[in-house]
Structure formats: structure tokens, C-alpha cells
């Protein structure tokens, strides 16, 4: 069976799925194999609990056109992306696993088990382009609205001994590292030189020019001599940068001369030429001013949107990827407050996060658990004005009342213990749900993958726990009757 992946430029129509149909019972779903499958399987349970209809409404709004090829159903698209992030499959591995696994086929909404792949690996790229970060954030909100509202939940970080939830919001930021080579000035300039040489060769073949003098063999030999040195001195590094800057400048002059004469490059080379121009200007500025800092510094030619994010941690003082500002409410459900590849101060976003909490719940939280970077005077003043207790010590001199100091220390200890929940969330999202290393090559698909990772962590975390508690309480009530 052949598959054709439709590009986003083509007109695609969508037919909303009729969720009134009854999917075959899971016992008979794989009857062709002559065996019965486990109804307690994790994927079967999640398939019957997720808000597919709410997601269907959001997904159908992405298709304004009523003509064209019919797109795949929403449940197949989101289900496949959820499986991929949860299990860590590549695109080809995902298709083969779905083809072999009846549990996965049930999860993505197939009516019966089939031996034919339900979609092609190339379609996953188009799905990730279509399922944008904004769409995933809305789908994540729909997932939160579908969570059962428990009156007396089990003990969580936001609950008290009486089983009553305290309106709580935890805020923190982390970086989702991008899968790029560790950037060095010499390696970036050498990569830029190689790309420019490739483009120059294309110009010469395409328009019949004689090859200009690029000194590529000498440049390659000089770079290898530098790269083989284990601990190059500062003087050696500057000499290597100066040499590579000269070769890059020469190649850029050749390309600029070609284009000024009216010869156009191939479409696939335009972004590389623009990126190398910016990279050369940045590296030249840092070399001439003897500095290592420049605004909007490029650390990857293939992914020029990636920026260095200074974290100040012992293991990773600088990370390269998108910075994620996350908030978790008292039920353990996480939401993305801000997501960007540019560096920013998360402390300035606390008030926006509190206003978003108020918009969703019609009231401010009783307490907000944050680290030291959020405790600015503006944020403390805002929290005091709106009767929000912000974690951390009070400003001013300590009280002379020993009992008050004892209670304050006890409250601070509980706040520190409860704030660990967001660190735990980051750990699960990075180790288990695909946020540990983003391997997508496009900016939009990288952001949507990070947002999907947050939603998947909610599905198999807080949402799963809330549904399990609800079903447990419901079964106890039924038995008592």
C-alpha cells in the first residue's frame, strides 16, 4: 500500500469524526489473531479516558477549506504523537510498532485490528507542523477541564490533613536542550566555510563559472592542526579564529559578487547564506573587541534560532534550547506560561502566571511557591495586595516572638517540600516523555514537541491519578449501596 504525504501548502479538508459509533470491545478487537487482549492495559485505559471529542473540535478548526484531500482523524494524529513521545520511538519505528501492536491501534482509534500501516512515516512531519504549540496548549487546557473534580482527594502537595485542597501555584523555569553540537567559535566558522564552499561549487556548476581561489585545502589543514591540540592556548584560539574569519570573508565576497551580477542561488541555500552573514558579523565583532558576548548569538548554523541560556548550575552553567516557564496548580496539573528560545527572566512573568490562574479559577491562589529569583519587590507587593502568600522569608528584621518564628520555620519547610513537585515534574518530562533532548530540526516543530511533552506528562501523571481516584471512589460508593 502506498502513502502520499500531503504538504501544508496543498488544500486539505477535514471530516470530523462521529464519536457516536461504538468501537469494538477490546476483547474482540484482535479476534483475527485468535486471542484475547488485556483490558487492564495502560493504553486501553487512557484511550477511554482522554477528551477526544474536545480535541476534535480544536483540531477541526485548523481546516478552514472544504475541498481537497481528507486529512487523518484527530485521534490518530494526537494518539500517534502521544505514543511516540511516551515510548521514545523514531518516525519509522512508530509506524512499525503501531502496525504490530493492537493496543496502539486501539489507542489511535482504529475500529478493528489491521496488518496494514495506518499511516506513513512522512506524515508525522506534516502532523508536527500542523499541531502547533498554541494548539497543544489549548488541548492541554481541555485535558485539565476533563479531569474529575474530587472533593476529598488523597494527600498531595496542595492538600491539608482534612483532605481540603489549598489553592496553590508553583512556578519555575527549565530548559529543554536541543540536539546540537556543543558550539565553539572555531568549529562554527569551519562549518560556515564548508557550507560556503559547497554553495560556490554549485554556482560554478550551474552558471559555468571557473572556480575561484578559496584555499580550501590550506584552510582544512589549519583547522585540523588546531582541532588536534588537546589544550590550545588563548593565543592559538585567536589565531585559529582569525584564520577561519579570513576564509569565510573571502567566500562571502565571492557569493556577494555572483548575486550582485544577477545570478540567483538555489532556494535551499538562501537561509544558510543569511545565517553565515550574521555569524561572520558576530564572530568578527567578538574577535575585534576581545569579548565572548554578543546579542542573539548564533550557536548552530542549521538551527539558527537556538540561543545559549545561562543557567548558573554547577553541572551545566549554559544550556542550548528553549526556555520553558511552567506552573503547576494544587491538583498537580502543569501549564505552559511562556516558551521561547530567547533568554528571559522568569521572575518578571510571575504576575502574568497569577493572572492566568485567576482567569481560569476566578480567584487568586492562596499561596505561590517559587524560588529566590521570583521574590522581587514588585512581585512581593503584588502578592501582598491580593492576599497571596509567597514562599520564602519575610522582608525586614526577624520577629522576637519565638512561637511566631517557630510557625514561620514550619511553614517555610512545608513550602520547600511542596515546591519539589515541580522539580519532580521536570525530571519525569525529561527522562520519560521526550523533553530531555529535542531532536527536531525546525523551530515550530521543536516548540510543539516541548508542549506535547508537557501534555503527555499530564496524561500519565495528574490526569491518570485523578481518574484512578475517581473510579476508586465510585466503585466504593457502588459497593456500599
Predicted regions and their residues:
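Acidic, metal-coordinating catalytic cores used for nucleic-acid/nucleotide bond scission
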Residues: 67-72, 102, 369-377, 397
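Electropositive, glycine- and tryptophan-enriched low-complexity nucleic-acid-binding patches
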Residues: 313-359
Amino acid at each position: 500500500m502506498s502513502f502520499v504525504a500531503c504538504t501544508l501548502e496543498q488544500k486539505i479538508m477535514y471530516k470530523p469524526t462521529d464519536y457516536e459509533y461504538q468501537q469494538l470491545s477490546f476483547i474482540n478487537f484482535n479476534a483475527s489473531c485468535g486471542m484475547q487482549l488485556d483490558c487492564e492495559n495502560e493504553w486501553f485505559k487512557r484511550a477511554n479516558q482522554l477528551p477526544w471529542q474536545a480535541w476534535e473540535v480544536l483540531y477541526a478548526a485548523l481546516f478552514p477549506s472544504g475541498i481537497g484531500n481528507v486529512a487523518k482523524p484527530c485521534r490518530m494524529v494526537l494518539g500517534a504523537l502521544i505514543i511516540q513521545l511516551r515510548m521514545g520511538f523514531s518516525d519509522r519505528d512508530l509506524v512499525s510498532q503501531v502496525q504490530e501492536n493492537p493496543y496502539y491501534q486501539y489507542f489511535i482509534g482504529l475500529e478493528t485490528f489491521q496488518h496494514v500501516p495506518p499511516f506513513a512515516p512522512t506524515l508525522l512531519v506534516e502532523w508536527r507542523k500542523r499541531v502547533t504549540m498554541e494548539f497543544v496548549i489549548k488541548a492541554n487546557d481541555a485535558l485539565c477541564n476533563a479531569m474529575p473534580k474530587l472533593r476529598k482527594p488523597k494527600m498531595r502537595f496542595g492538600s491539608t490533613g482534612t483532605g481540603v485542597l489549598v489553592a496553590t501555584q508553583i512556578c519555575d523555569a527549565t530548559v529543554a536542550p536541543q540536539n546540537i553540537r556543543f558550539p565553539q567559535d572555531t568549529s562554527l566558522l569551519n562549518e560556515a566555510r564548508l557550507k560556503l564552499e559547497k554553495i560556490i561549487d554549485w554556482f560554478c556548476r550551474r552558471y559555468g563559472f571557473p572556480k575561484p581561489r578559496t584555499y580550501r585545502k590550506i584552510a582544512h589543514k589549519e583547522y585540523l592542526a588546531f582541532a588536534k591540540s588537546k589544550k590550545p592556548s588563548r593565543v592559538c584560539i585567536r589565531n585559529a579564529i582569525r584564520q577561519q574569519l579570513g576564509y569565510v570573508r573571502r567566500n562571502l565576497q565571492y557569493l556577494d559578487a555572483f548575486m550582485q551580477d544577477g545570478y540567483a542561488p538555489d532556494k535551499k541555500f538562501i537561509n544558510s547564506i543569511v545565517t553565515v552573514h550574521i555569524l561572520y558579523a558576530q564572530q568578527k565583532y567578538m574577535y575585534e573587541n576581545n569579548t565572548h558576548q554578543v546579542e542573539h548569538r548564533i550557536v548552530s548554523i542549521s538551527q539558527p534560532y537556538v540561543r545559549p541560556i545561562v543557567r548558573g548550575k554547577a553541572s551545566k552553567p549554559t544550556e542550548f534550547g528553549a526556555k520553558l516557564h511552567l506552573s503547576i496548580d494544587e491538583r498537580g496539573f502543569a501549564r505552559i506560561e511562556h516558551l521561547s528560545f530567547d533568554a528571559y527572566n522568569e521572575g518578571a512573568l510571575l504576575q502574568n502566571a497569577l493572572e492566568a490562574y485567576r482567569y481560569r479559577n476566578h480567584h487568586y491562589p492562596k499561596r505561590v511557591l517559587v524560588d529566590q529569583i521570583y521574590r522581587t519587590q514588585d512581585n512581593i507587593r503584588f502578592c501582598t495586595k491580593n492576599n497571596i502568600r509567597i514562599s520564602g522569608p519575610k522582608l525586614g528584621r526577624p520577629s522576637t516572638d519565638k512561637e511566631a518564628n517557630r510557625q514561620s520555620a514550619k511553614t517555610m519547610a512545608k513550602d520547600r517540600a511542596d515546591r519539589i513537585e515541580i522539580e519532580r515534574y521536570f525530571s519525569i518530562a525529561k527522562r520519560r516523555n521526550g523533553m530531555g533532548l529535542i531532536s527536531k530540526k525546525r523551530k515550530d516543530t521543536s516548540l510543539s514537541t516541548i508542549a506535547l511533552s508537557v501534555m503527555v506528562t499530564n496524561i500519565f501523571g495528574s490526569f491518570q491519578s485523578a481518574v484512578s481516584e475517581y473510579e476508586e471512589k465510585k466503585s466504593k460508593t457502588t459497593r456500599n449501596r
